[in-house]
């Protein structure tokens, strides 16, 4: 199934179970989604340099659940639905294509560039994926930031003013850790 990322068949089943339990029954569903267990798993995964080959069933589920906790089920179901309308030529055929296609669909569904978030998890993203998402704002307040993963600095609106032969005033905006606010430097 093209909407199932490499190595995540069991994760997809668990994800569907979480959705059904939360949406239809009104309970959290499984003890493995307990906040303490999730925190321990993520700490272990990121301490091991977020190697995608170690992206196990429950760790992969955490990747999806964090997105669900930020935006709800809507963007996830929207992103998954896209796969069922793809022409055969557009169905991802390699692991790398599957990871990159998912990041494009979920980013467009949330309205945020989730490439840095998925890169933090170790997804093998291409430059084309990053470039395709430059029109979307980066999700700068994701819960990985600071606690589990240290992102590269996000700089935007880099400008130079008052240029002379010996000096230049440079200004830019950076995101502050865990805050969706831009500050001018």
Model-predicted regions and their roles:
Residues 39-130:
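Active-site-proximal alpha-helical
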Residues 1-40:
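Zinc-dependent metallopeptidase catalytic helix centered on the HExxH motif
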